[in-house]
From Swiss-Prot:
GO cellular component terms attached to this protein's record: cytosolic large ribosomal subunit
Organism phylogeny: Bacteria, Pseudomonadati, Myxococcota, Myxococcia, Myxococcales
Protein name: Large ribosomal subunit protein uL14
Family: Belongs to the universal ribosomal protein uL14 family.
Organism: Myxococcus xanthus (strain DK1622)
Top-level taxonomic group: Bacteria
UniProt GO MF annotations: large ribosomal subunit rRNA binding; structural constituent of ribosome
Function: Binds to 23S rRNA. Forms part of two intersubunit bridges in the 70S ribosome.
Length: 122
């Protein structure tokens, strides 16, 4: 469960390391985002000579959360940290690699490029 002011790790090689959630997209009164949701973020930490710089505003899709997410078969999945992947206006990832596992819920949200780049889908 991600809300405004949440700090997330970045799970791609776009150059950003930490991002700060400034808006949850999907309705004016929406407070929380979960796996597969798109948020607006500000880059708080970035590597030098990278595609994104500190202070840049971008969109990101959440790929891992500490909060458990229920599945239709009754099982739950949760991760050790909150992570996101930066995306462009066409909903394609900015980076060319994804680090760590991602949740299967991204497939239902049509983020196939992220699914194909991820080393493991749980």
């Amino acid at each position: 469960m991600i809300q405004m002011t949440s700090v997330l790790d970045v799970a791609d090689n776009s150059g950003a390391k930490k991002v700060f959630c400034i808006k949850v997209l999907g309705g004016s009164k929406r407070k929380y985002a979960s796996i597969g949701d798109v948020i607006v973020v500000s880059v708080r930490e970035a590597l030098p000579n990278s595609k994104v710089k500190k202070g840049d505003v971008a969109k990101a899709v959440i790929v891992r959360t500490k909060r458990e997410v229920g599945r239709p078969d009754g099982s739950y999945i949760k991760f050790d940290g909150n992570s996101a992947v930066l995306i462009n206006k066409d909903m394609e990832p900015i980076g060319t690699r994804i680090f760590g596992p991602v949740a299967r819920e991204l497939r239902a949200r049509k983020f196939m490029k992220i699914i194909s780049l991820a080393p493991e889908v749980l």
